[in-house]
Amino acid sequence: MRKFEDTYRHKGLRKKLVETVKQKGIQDEKVLDAINNIPRHFFLDSAFDEVAYEDRAFPILEKQTISQPYTVAYQSQLLDVKPFMKVLEIGTGSAYQASVLAELGVQVYTIERQKKLFEFNKKFDYLRKYPNIKFFYGDGYEGLPTFAPFDRVLITAAAPDVPMKLIQQMKTGGKMVIPMGSGDIQVMKRITKLENGELQTEVFDQFSFVPMLVGKND
């Protein structure tokens, strides 16, 4: 059984990672603190221990990836959360992004469509540190209407169009951060739901995400 240790060396590498992310333009100190607090190497196979704090994506279970820390920080900063907000995350993956959000003091409702990943995260001891994360197995396009409305929605996969069912589950004044596009490169957008029901869209930088898929995978 794997033994999880967060050594002084790991903490030193994490500080360097935070500096790298900061130099790339992340300014939100709370987001930087969250990256600094979370042992990213816990979320990866032990084979990646030496490189876990490089600013790049790595493979995890079910042909999925743990996102580049800069991307996680970028989306978290754009989401602009405040403590106790309800956040819907589509695509739990490694649960690293969910942990960053949990460090920011929000209530995270995260959906994973890959059953093996969902079950792995349910057994991942480190995540017990965050009682403010609730894990769900399901189709991200459907969201979680039972728990709506949400203050924020974070999509961690590329969507060709705005998922309107998720917009309906947002509060008035709520924000969605979503990488949009059907090619290899997507544009990060932030969509705000206005009082009159209209959507205000802000366009940001380009990224590369795996596509957001319909349905569940047993």
Annotate each PLM feature:
Residues 1-88, 96-100, 104, 117-120, ...:
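Class I SAM-dependent transferase core
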Residues 80-200:
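Conserved nucleotide-cofactor-binding alpha/beta core module
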